[in-house]
Amino acid sequence: MEDSMDMDMSPLRPQNYLFGCELKADRDYHFKVDNDENEHQLSLRTVSLGAGAKDELHVVEAEAMNYEGSPIKVTLATLKMSVQPTVSLGGFEITPPVVLRLKCGSGPVHISGQHLVAVEEDAESEEEEEEEVKLLSISGKRSAPGSGSKVPQKKVKLAADEDEDDDDDDDDDDDEDDDDDDFDEEVEEKAPVKKSVRDTPAKNAQKSNQNGKDSKPSTPRSKGQESFKKQEKTPKTPRGPSSVEDIKAKMQASIEKGGSLPKVEAKFINYVKNCFRMTDQEAIQDLWQWRKSL
């Protein structure tokens, strides 16, 4: 049940608001919300006596609906200024509507907590994501026809670079030969032979190193571009609302795992809208009739 709920509640974005009220002997507090599609929770944190409260017994009571949809009253805290002026509830969550009252004592009593609202994501953000997916798919289609011509261009460029490197090597060799001719006039005839033997492996090593450096990067570049194009051609598709049969199957699976479904029609309708994003009233009524038959 928890896994299915996490999966279905993913489009909802929680928001937290501060909550606080003051209770007196003749003043109750009613917490109500508009009948919208968002889920609301009242999380109570602390109950404490206010300044000027008498040293007498104060009993704080909450009235809300139980799982069966019937009203129920629960004692939240019992306070006394000289014994226990404050109580921490540690996140006591109640689904509205809720009535908070001071059953015993004159007050004042302060209650603080949080108002939790599960808000659906804006439709504008979803439309922007769809537009980005469309742009990626269009750019992928446009770049596909010209992809085959990039490799020969790289090969031609590589060959041109090798020719330029060879020309540079020849120029360097000519300069070295000119210097050697000037030096040969002062030494014996055996010296040029030794120098030519020493220069030959160095020239070959330079050419082999240059050829090795120029020829290696061509392969990984083409593979990276092809993998990026494959990612552009497979955009994500947004998930739409589930069908009635799929929703029934998910509910039945959650019941078999030990979960339960709301028994009150209003809560069941709100549960279907939020969890499965179902807006068809006929389909919702069909699901409610199916729920009552279980």
Swiss-Prot record:
Keywords: Acetylation, ADP-ribosylation, Chaperone, Cytoplasm, Cytoskeleton, Disulfide bond, Isopeptide bond, Nucleus, Phosphoprotein, RNA-binding, Ubl conjugation
Gene3D superfamilies: 1.10.10.2100, Nucleoplasmin core domain
Pfam families to which the protein is assigned, alphabetical: NPM1-C, Nucleoplasmin
Cross-link (Glycyl lysine isopeptide (Lys-Gly) (interchain with G-Cter in SUMO2)): 32, 141, 150, 216, 248, 250, 257, 263, 267, 273
Region (Required for nucleolar localization) location: 243-294
Region (Disordered): 121-249
Modified residues (N6-acetyllysine): 32, 150, 154, 213, 229-230, 250, 257, 267, 273, 292
Location of Phosphothreonine modifications: 75, 95, 200, 219, 234, 237, 279
Residues passing through the membrane, by range: none
UniProt keyword Disulfide bond present: yes
Residues with PTM Phosphotyrosine: 67
Family the entry assigns: Belongs to the nucleoplasmin family.
Annotated protein name in UniProt: Nucleophosmin
Organism: Bos taurus (Bovine)
